[in-house]
Design a protein with these regions (language model features):
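A domain-start/cap signature at the N-terminus of enzymes
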Residues: 80-193
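Gly/Ser-rich "nucleophile elbow"/oxyanion-hole loop immediately N-terminal to the catalytic nucleophile
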Residues: 185-191, 233-264, 276-280
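Short beta-strand element of the alpha/beta-hydrolase
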Residues: 191-202
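Primarily recognizes the serine-hydrolase "nucleophile elbow" in alpha/beta-hydrolase
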Residues: 256-300
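Short beta-strand/loop motif that positions the catalytic acidic residue
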Residues: 306-308
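C-terminal catalytic histidine-bearing segment of alpha/beta-hydrolase fold enzymes
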Residues: 313, 318-420
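Solvent-exposed alpha-helical segments and adjacent loops
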Residues: 414, 426-429, 435-680, 813, ...
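Solvent-exposed loop/linker segments at secondary-structure transitions
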Residues: 491-496, 500-525, 538-546, 562, ...
């Protein structure tokens, strides 16, 4: 066991023994609209719903230094007169009528999500639990009991104590999304208490993974995140943030002591959320989680306590060992315990769990004015802020944006900015003396002098190759563009999926199928149902309590167009909403051609288009348009939504072949929605584009040179993004977009281990680059092997190798490709072995 106790958490991750009820299927389409405020929209039952939450415009903490961190919540459920409603019988109509009364009363808005959730459970219990009549009766009885309880006592929310299931009303679709909350026995609204947010593992849910018991001192919160396997990204991520807002609104939470904890997928999610919103969280405790694909500098203000068994082959220990060593080197606060013998069940390591549980209450999020150093990388437009600094406008390249800021003596700010056109500084929240001049030294630029008294806010702007300081930020008639792909529509704001109703019968059926697949996903991809699922028949990768809202194009209202992000399915001929926008979109489907507004044209035969763009009718909202003349493009698992929605992407448009999973081309915008030229990017050699194996070797060669390393791993992608690229059309830019922020690491292996690894990965089409020459490998010599974050898990599962000498290196796959390309791969001599980071310097 290795144990680092350094200046920097998790509780037990419980393996689920059963699965809870889940989302609607097929025909159960929810057409309710929760917007605008006070507006009511009918659904099948005729019930009404009112808006209770504002859409999230990024995740911001309460104002630093204000009483918001300590005062009792100001927006508890308002006292309301008890309605004299006759006792309703337990029937289909009785609870429904009482629920309708609650949902139609704005002063009972705090209960709308809970009622919506109970309605869903009651309505779908028979279909999901036909063989469990007791469960069916229980769900229906719970709706009847709670509607009566709320109408009899509108302040019942204030009186809840102990462990309870609850739900909030999601602004995404008006559904009730559940969570479990432990309200401490000593809770007093006048005295805010800490909050620990638990994120469940894959196959789990908010009820089963959180082993909550009544106690005093702090709140516990377990969040579903839309699906059992939502990975706490896209809508699953938004769910956590919106539940946090809801709980903080209705209970007195100390926002300076909000902690994340999770195991497996939940541990990975805890690190993901902490890296995206460091200003929100006081600590992170993770069991067998992965930090491999996280911007590690983002975590320097968030203490981390990690437990990971050395023999975990489901989520290999390398996913924490290397990244957390890198975080430590960056100045982070990290504790890592690596016992052995627990596999993926390291929550059974009682001593480590006890230490982590004792550690986290001591962690307090720093006040904004105490934070003198920030090192933040933004991957998309949903998470662009760290404490007092925020990206106001992206730079010109389709890659992540980064700022590194350090406050020095005498009101001096040292700044290193990459791919940023405008950086917003909240000086009133920063550690500067407002009565003294500010000197800003941006790397490579003349010093900027800001006279005293300092403004509350300042924007650093890059204009005409020079930096200036201004007291106002960028202005545009549309929402500014940010990279990241179609998941930016899945940020917690209102969302509507719109399918076309025009064309032949087969096309219309395909469009409806596509809408159904999209409605069951918590992100912009349209995945096929996972093979595994709960005892309710819901696949782990599908929304558990309600599909996303769907409408036919002919039913879309002006309010829908103005207030929602829109997923548009179909061509202008197939979808009338697309037809109304087509002339103002940057690409059009004209017969057998795609016409781009920069004058370029390309074939549309056997091809599908995916596009992310602002909505011309509502410039603050986004659209995600998927279109093809071939109905086969609208099947679940289609490549265009996969490429733009499964992971962050540098592409804003993709053209894919329909007949097989091949990427033809991708395109990206600058911050003002102007196409970046493809002509400046080199064509992929035809022989590489046509062969995924050869292309993988070429990518590995670039990674090996950049690391540097003796060998690099080729193949074993996880997940596979595409099988091939279109010869004669695909360019290096397409490869870069699909490797958007893919970190690289290097492990050190003995020659004997390297040979054994090569044999172990060969049956799975994994190879080493350059090819292993057994006659030249010395068994006891050390060799450096480079691999990407996506290759770690399959490599360790096949080889069972998790070497001590393992480090995350600077740069990523895209940077390696930008520097070395995929042509001309001269052999590079074996490199000298560099020293291992101090924290990892242990014997083999």
């Amino acid at each position: 066991m290795r144990y680092w106790m350094l200046p920097v958490a998790l509780c037990a991750c419980v393996t689920p023994t059963s699965s809870a009820p889940g989302p609607a299927t097929g025909s159960d389409v929810n057409l309710v609209s929760a917007f605008p405020t006070g507006a009511a929209s009918p659904i099948e039952s005729g019930w009404l719903v009112a808006k209770t939450m504002q859409p999230r415009q990024g995740a911001h903490p309460p104002e630093q230094g204000s009483e918001a961190l300590t005062q009792a919540p100001s927006a508890e459920p308002a006292a309301a007169p008890v309605v004299d409603v006759p006792e309703a019988p337990l029937s289909a109509d009785g609870p429904a009528l009482l629920a309708q009364q609650i949902l139609s009363r704005p002063e009972l808005a705090a209960y709308h999500g809970w009622i919506r959730y109970l309605e869903f459970r009651a309505a779908h219990a028979s279909a999901r639990f036909a063989d469990q009549p007791g469960a069916v009766v229980e769900d229906r009885l719970r709706l009847a009991q709670w509607t009566r309880k709320i109408l009899d006592n509108p302040n019942v929310l204030r009186e809840l104590r102990g462990v309870t299931e609850w739900a909030y009303l999601s602004p995404v679709d008006g559904s009730g999304q559940p969570f479990k909350l432990n309200i401490p026995s000593d809770y007093d609204p006048a005295h805010p208490l800490p909050l620990s947010i638990e994120l469940h593992g894959r196959s789990g849910n908010h009820l089963e993974d959180a082993d909550m018991r009544e106690h005093a001192g702090y709140f516990e919160l377990s969040v579903l995140g839309r699906a059992r396997a939502g990975s706490y990204r896209a809508l699953s991520e938004a769910d956590v943030l919106q539940v946090l807002d809801y709980v903080s609104q209705h209970w007195a939470v100390d926002r300076s002591r909000v902690h994340l904890v999770g195991g497996g997928m939940g541990g990975t999610g805890a690190l993901w959320l902490a890296s995206r919103y460091p200003q929100l969280f006081a600590s992170g405790r993770t069991v067998c989680g992965s930090a491999s694909d996280k911007p590690l500098g983002n975590l320097i203000t968030v203490p981390i306590y990690a437990l990971h068994s050395e023999d975990d082959y489901r989520v290999p220990v390398l996913h924490t060992r290397g990244p957390l060593a890198k975080l430590l080197a960056l100045g982070g606060n990290v504790t890592l315990e690596e016992p052995n013998g627990y596999g993926h069940a390291v929550w059974k390591y009682e001593q480590g769990t006890a230490r982590a549980d004792a550690w986290f209450p001591q962690q307090v999020r720093p006040e904004s004015r105490e934070v003198k150093r920030l090192d933040f990388t933004a991957l998309d437009g949903a998470a662009v802020r760290a404490y007092w600094a925020e990206i106001a406008e992206w730079g010109p390249e389709p890659k992540p944006a980064h700022f590194a800021l350090k406050v020095g003596s005498k009101n001096r700010l040292e700044a290193r900015l990459d791919n940023i056109r405008s950086l917003h500084l909240r000086l009133a929240e920063a550690p500067f003396d407002a009565d003294q001049p500010l000197r800003v030294n941006i790397e490579g630029a003349p010093v900027l002098n800001v006279p005293a008294p300092l403004p509350a806010e300042l924007w650093l702007e890059h204009v005409d190759s020079s930096w200036t300081a201004a007291e106002s930020g960028p202005v545009a008639p549309f929402r500014l563009h940010t990279p990241g792909g179609a998941n930016q529509l899945y940020d917690g704001e209102p969302l509507l999926i719109v399918y076309g109703t025009h064309g032949d019968a087969a096309t219309q059926a395909a469009l409806r199928v596509a809408a159904g697949a999209a409605s069951r996903s918590s992100n912009a991809s349209w995945p096929k149902p996972a093979r595994d699922g709960g005892n309710d028949g819901v696949a782990y990768n599908q929304n558990l309590y309600g599909e996303l809202n769907i409408k036919a194009d002919v039913d879309v209202t002006p309010e829908d167009r103005a207030q929602r992000h829109l997923v548009l399915i179909g061509t202008a001929e197939q979808n009338s909403v697309v037809a109304a926008l087509a002339a103002r979109l940057p690409v059009r489907l004209e017969g057998d051609e795609l016409a781009w507004n920069d004058g370029s044209r390309s074939s549309a035969r056997d091809r599908a288009l995916g596009l992310v763009h602002y909505n011309p009718d509502a410039p603050s909202r986004l659209i995600f348009w998927v279109a093809s003349n071939d109905a086969a493009a609208y099947a679940a698992g289609s490549l265009a939504p996969e490429l733009l929605g499964a992971l962050p992407s540098g592409a804003d448009a993709v053209v894919v072949r329909v007949s097989d999973p091949t990427l033809v081309a991708s395109r990206s915008f600058d911050s003002r929605w102007r196409w970046l030229s493809r002509d400046q990017s080199a064509l992929l050699p035809a022989e590489l584009a046509a062969s995924s194996a050869d292309l993988a070797r070429a990518v590995a060669a670039a990674v090996r040179r950049a690391a540097p390393a003796d060998f690099a791993l080729a193949g074993l992608p996880e997940p596979a993004r595409t099988s091939a690229y279109e010869p004669g059309e695909a360019r290096l830019a397409d490869l870069l977009a699909q490797n958007y922020f893919t970190p690289v690491s290097v492990m050190t292996l003995l020659g004997s281990e390297l040979v054994a690894a090569a044999h172990a990965i060969a049956p799975s089409d994994g190879v080493l680059e350059p090819e292993l020459d057994l006659s030249r490998i010395q068994p006891q010599r050390e060799y450096r092997l480079a691999l990407s974050a996506r290759q770690i898990s399959p490599f360790v599962r096949l080889t069972h190798l998790a070497p001590r000498k393992y480090e995350v290196v600077e740069g990523d796959v895209a940077r390696a490709l930008s520097r070395y390309g995929v042509t001309g791969m001269p052999s590079v001599p074996a490199v000298a072995n560099r020293a291992t980071p101090p924290a990892l310097a242990t014997s083999r």
